[in-house]
Amino acid sequence: TTLFRSDVILEVLRKYKEQGREFETVCCIYSTAPFVTPERLREAYGKMNSEIDSVFTCVAYSYPIQRSLHIVDGKISMVYPEYKNARSQDLEPIYHDAGQFYFSRTAPFVESRTFWGENTAGLVLSELEVQDLDTQTDWALAEMKYELLHK
């Protein structure tokens, strides 16, 4: 059986509720996120209000995905050919989940069973603050970014 992040957090919240403890907010921090800081956690927490139920970290793709390519049967072509002549600096930034942490007001989280509801905001990070850790190369990049951040 695969347990998802939300299932685990819902179970923890249920166990605490059984013990008479309830929380207004919940935060999930990934153990593989080496650049999480107290300042960024406070910043994300501060974004939640009457209109925002959840906040998670995101980062812009390093190159516009509008100019992305795919290879089919050995031939390369643009995914979005309408952007063939567009300058990369003129294209809208597109973001992806940075996989660091997720904040939510507890009641909407329990109701929707997700950190990503319709009232979710993103906390945009710089590329220096984000590094996936799946390979040895990823680890080496994280070390280099750490050095740059702490000069």
Regions flagged by a language model, labelled:
Residues T2-L3:
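Short, small-residue-biased leader/transition segments that mark boundaries at the very start
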Residues D7, I94-K151:
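Conserved alpha/beta core of the MobA/IspD/sugar-nucleotide pyrophosphorylase nucleotidyltransferase superfamily
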Residues D7-V12, R40-E43, K47, L141:
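Alpha-helical elements of Rossmann-like donor-binding domains used by nucleotide-donor carbohydrate transfer enzymes
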Residues R14-G20:
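Phosphate/pyrophosphate-binding loops at sites that engage ATP/ADP/AMP, CoA/4′-phosphopantetheine
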Residues R21-T32:
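Short beta-strand-to-loop acidic/aromatic patch adjacent to the donor-nucleotide binding site
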Residues T32, S54-T57, R105, T135:
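Generic structural signal for small/hydrophobic residues in well-ordered secondary structure
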Residues P38-I65, V72-K75:
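Basic phosphate/pyrophosphate-binding loop/patch that engages nucleotide-derived ligands
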Residues G74-P93:
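Short, flexible, basic/aromatic active-site loop/helix in glycosyltransferases
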